Regions:
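A short beta-loop-alpha structural element at the N-terminal edge
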Residues: 15-27
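Helix-loop element at the rim of GNAT/NAT acetyltransferase active sites that forms part
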Residues: 30-47
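Terminal substrate-recognition subdomain of acyl/acetyltransferases
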Residues: 1-13, 103, 160, 167-181
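Short glycine/proline-centered loop/turn elements that form peptide/ligand docking sites
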Residues: 115, 119, 141-145, 162-168
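Conserved catalytic-core motifs of GNAT/GCN5-like acyltransferases
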Residues: 135-138, 150, 155-172
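Conserved GNAT acetyl-CoA-binding A-motif
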Residues: 119, 126-137
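Acetyl-CoA-dependent GNAT
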Residues: 48-108, 119, 180-181
Length: 181
């Protein structure tokens, strides 16, 4: 699956949204470390990453060759500033219609339209891959993300009041959302 689109950010600068390639592994890992240190709303902490550049390159190669999964990066100002992905929930017949979606954006680029553009890109890719349902999990306190997802058509289908346990703020409620494609 391939994706490439140039967008104009709200600050007037441009960003290229495209497939992550194996050669992007170092930049993607750096972006992961930065984004996951900037907010408590993401699933993992930077020190929990088990990937090195070689393993990340293999992961990105598998995504680049996949017909139904994708890893998209946003490149602006000469660096990777955001990532997003669509992943199959499972390969068994009863699960093949479902995909998961996630996005992370560097704090310096929040509010510029990257989250919206990457969400739209992932929805488009999920449709093209033949999925019938796109799902995500979001921390209930992440009101900006929830508003973005609702605007894109996602609806809440469940909550887990102790879904995440943050090192700094204790338990966090998570919301499960889905979009019928």
């Amino acid at each position: 699956m391939t994706y490439s689109r140039q967008i104009v950010l709200k600050n007037g600068n441009t960003a290229l949204l495209r497939n992550a390639e194996p050669s992007d592994a170092g930049a993607v890992l750096e972006n992961f470390s930065l984004t996951h240190a900037e907010t408590d709303y993401l699933l993992t902490y930077p020190d929990e990453s088990t990937f090195d550049a070689e393993r990340e390159a293999r992961f990105l190669q598998r995504k680049a060759e996949s017909a139904n999964e994708i890893e998209i990066i946003a490149v602006a100002d000469g660096r990777v500033v955001a990532t997003a992905g669509v992943d199959a929930v499972g390969t068994r017949d009863k699960l093949r219609h479902r995909a998961e979606f996630g996005v992370s954006v560097l704090r310096a680029y929040w509010g510029l339209g990257l989250g919206r553009a990457l969400t739209e890109a992932c929805i488009q890719c999920a449709k093209e891959a033949g999925y019938e349902q796109l799902e995500l999990t979001v921390v209930a306190e992440n009101e900006r993300a929830i508003a973005l997802y609702r605007k894109a058509g996602f609806v809440e289908f469940g909550r887990n009041p102790r879904g995440f346990r943050s090192r700094t703020s204790g338990y966090q409620e998570i919301i499960h959302m889905l979009l019928a494609l």
